Amino acid sequence: MPPRLCVRCNTSRAMLNRPKTQEQVCRECFFTAFEEEVHQTIVDNKLFKHGERLAVAASGGKDSTVLAHIMSTLNARYNYGLDLFLLSIDEGITGYRDDSLETVKRNEQQYGIPLKVVSYKELYGWTMDEIVSQIGTKNNCTFCGVFRRQALDRGAVLMGANKIATGHNADDVAETVLLNILRGDVPRLGRCANIITGEDSSLPRVKPFKYAYEKEIVLYAYYKKLDYFSTECIYAPFAARGFAREFIKDLEAARPLAIIDVIRSAEDFVFAAASDEKLPQPRTCERCGYISSQPVCKACVLLEGLNRGMPRLGVSRTRGRRGEKAGLHPDVGRGGGGGSSGPAEVASPVEIVYETT
């Protein structure tokens, strides 16, 4: 039997089945299709303007490494005119982040993109290892999600960025939609699939990989022989998001287009309640000056507990947005190793209860 030919060029041998479209394609046609789809996403959604300074959130994992490679490639190919730099957050997780940062440093040399590293220790006086030693593994992602989001913003502002690009892919967005449905968070459900978030703040975030499947990102990194760090965060197994991830994977196995269908459904959601129940307007934290929806930002609330020696968090999940209205902390972020840098638009209302140990 003759070898199967690529359905796109009809000349080269088909090397893989695209998870997203089920097309049998050769490597070069896969590279071209993947890059062109990301470019089309950028153009259709007007993600960037010529001359903008863009922080590419870089963890060293597959998503952020492919994002750095793609942004560097497309920026040169289509003359986006972007001033790119890599922005990494050192959470202080021994045996994980220290190793992944070495990968990011190699990426800096490979792509010729300058790197800025911001650490939890310098910003907050704590590493994640120190925090986990105080609170245990149950709610560590609560701290990390809040601190990481603020650290990315602060690092980007420090470097004069206009926007932050994160490696959130289609799987991540679908998981976020599912989580907000399960949590009954109507306001965030109405906007969690947005490709641009934080437009009401001084530093918007964009997701060029919003429609890119995680499996295709892995294939792209593999066939391009990109240098990335593949070990999962040592605290990730304790993250609640993992359950949603497994469900999305099951849906994809049964029907590959299910991921895109979930995203498209969220884009088409129209909720009357969303217009009645507005999200809090951004203001400035009274303590640190960072943008916050409450008088005191979530990072400062969490830091106060740590610094007072009362770090234990009692987490009680509630329906809707009752927790956030009370100034409580949403569980944001992705417990994950080599993936995107920075949390998706997810809220999990929790109640902060400081207890003496």
UniProtKB/Swiss-Prot annotation:
Task: Name the SUPFAM superfamilies on file.
Answer: Adenine nucleotide alpha hydrolases-like (SSF52402)
Question: According to the UniProt record, which cysteines are disulfide-bonded?
Answer: none
Q: Basic and acidic residues compositional bias: what residue ranges? A: 321-332
Concerning Pfam families, the annotation shows:
ATP_bind_3, zn-ribbon_14
- Give the UniProt entry's GO cellular component terms: cytoplasm
Record Gene3D superfamilies: HUPs (3.40.50.620)
| Region described as Disordered | 314-348
Q: Which UniProt keywords apply?
A: Cytoplasm, RNA-binding, Transferase, tRNA processing, tRNA-binding
InterPro entries reported in the protein's UniProt record:
CTU1-like_ATP-bd, CTU1_C, Ncs6/Tuc1/Ctu1, Rossmann-like_a/b/a_fold, TilS/TtcA_N, tRNA_thiolation_TtcA_Ctu1
Q: Which GO terms describe its biological process?
A: protein urmylation; tRNA thio-modification; tRNA wobble uridine modification
* NCBIfam families assigned to the protein according to its UniProt record, in alphabetical order: TIGR00269 family protein (TIGR00269)
* Family listed: Belongs to the TtcA family. CTU1/NCS6/ATPBD3 subfamily.
Spell out the protein name for this chain: Cytoplasmic tRNA 2-thiolation protein 1
Q: Which organism is it from?
A: Chlamydomonas reinhardtii
